[in-house]
Amino acid sequence: MTGPVLEVTSLSLAFGLVHALDQIALAVQPAEIVSLIGPNGAGKSSLLNCLSGFYRPQQGRVVFRGRDITRLAPHRRAKAGIGRTFQGLQTYDSMTVRENVLSGFHTSMRGGLFAGFLYWPSGQREEAVFAEKAEEIIEFLELEELRHAPVGSLSYGLRKRVDLGRALALQPALLLLDEPMAGMNLEEKGDLARFILDIRDARQIPIVLVEHDMEVVMDISDRVAVMEWGRLIAEGAPAQIRQNPRVIAAYLGQE
């Protein structure tokens, strides 16, 4: 498609007298990583919740692939092609890596989750297709040797990778990542950053990333948008953001 994959205009959200978002305007282009940064309480997660449908703004529009989705429910947005990970893990710890990734395909299953288990022909065919796609995601994330391991037995970094695999199973046209590096060690962060870049480069999936690790943000972002008190105060390439006096005063000076 031509033009932005995602376009946000005049987006405002308030909880009583607290203005979480104030006239936010943002566009995400195809195969682009846009990072949202700012102090705690700046509105980053609120914006992600508006994009994924968990919050409904009082004003403004969210347009995804040319379609106004501002009033669309979260599950409808997922079906439309918006995948998301959360700050907390959304994995099923008693299930295997393979089963977790397969569970991510539920929005795409025309025959329903249990059709394959009931041995309906359409369900069996669909199950085979998604099993093949799940294997491809497992290999992409370098989890082949762990495909049959219970997720609860894995390290935190590997569980984060499985969580990302579940989001990829939605077959998204846009991926929203909420603080994916939180709680990870240096090696785990490096691995996950590499996979995020591969998602952009090999799969051509644009990504909106909320992240506090400035080294990761500056290394992998195409653009950085800076928020403060619900407002977008700066936007540009990482090198521009590093040298922006207002950003340094509001956020980077704290690092």
Regions found by a protein language model. Name each.
Residues 2-255:
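Glycine-rich phosphate-binding loops of nucleotide-dependent enzymes
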